[in-house]
């Protein structure tokens, strides 16, 4: 149901990440059908599914491009599910939107749009990844143990941020 938070529980190697990868389209299924909001997406690629699926990975270094700036990463996320050309996305209107969104993190990143993503700590990158996942509406947000690589204090911050973003956007989350 829309807005529900579903938790998948299992031991290491049980297939939790594989399950999320099949939903995202990065792994093809051998049989069965995957439907998102009543639409059969089984044969659609990960890029085609990106219109409906947002994702935050376990590894804070995944899901962002360390060689690109914060604003370039956010511009790519803003174009999720579309052809991704940075040039048209890096304009004053979008920069203001990115600053506004980043300000909710209270990490002063709204003043560092031109810094390379690789300069951020793991916790900062994970917070930005979560924010990037919510820039465009999606039908489902996949969180693959997105706090596992973080220290306890940062993990608590990212979980609080997750709750806020999921609630504000009424996201269905796994």
Residue ranges and their predicted role:
Residues 40-54, 62, 84-91, 95:
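ABC ATPase NBD coupling module
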Residues 24:
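Helix-to-loop junction immediately C-terminal to a conserved catalytic motif
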Residues 152-154:
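Helix N-cap at the start of a conserved alpha-helix in ABC-type nucleotide-binding domains
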Residues 133-134:
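ABC ATPase C-loop
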Residues 9-11:
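The feature captures the beta-strand-to-loop junction immediately N-terminal to the Walker
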Residues 141-145:
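Catalytic Walker B motif of ABC-type/P-loop ATPase nucleotide-binding domains
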Residues 67-83:
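Q-loop/switch helix immediately C-terminal to the Walker
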Residues 32-39:
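Conserved ABC transporter NBD signature motif
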């Amino acid at each position: 149901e829309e807005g529900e938070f579903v938790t998948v529980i299992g031991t290491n190697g049980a297939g939790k990440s594989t399950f999320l990868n099949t939903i995202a389209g990065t792994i093809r299924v051998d049989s069965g059908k995957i439907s998102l909001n009543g639409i059969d997406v089984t044969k659609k690629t990960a890029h085609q599914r990106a219109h409906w699926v947002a994702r935050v990975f376990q590894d804070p270094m995944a899901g962002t491009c360390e060689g690109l700036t914060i604003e370039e990463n956010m511009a790519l996320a803003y174009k999720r599910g579309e052809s991704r050309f940075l040039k048209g996305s890096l304009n004053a209107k979008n920069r203001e939107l990115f600053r506004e969104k980043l300000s909710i993190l209270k990490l002063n990143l709204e003043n560092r749009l031109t810094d390379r993503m690789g300069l951020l700590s793991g916790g900062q990158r994970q917070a930005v990844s979560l924010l990037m996942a919510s820039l465009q509406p999606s039908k489902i947000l996949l969180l693959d143990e997105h706090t596992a690589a973080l220290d306890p204090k940062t993990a608590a911050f990212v979980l609080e941020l997750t709750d806020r973003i999921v609630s504000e956007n009424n996201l269905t989350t796994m």
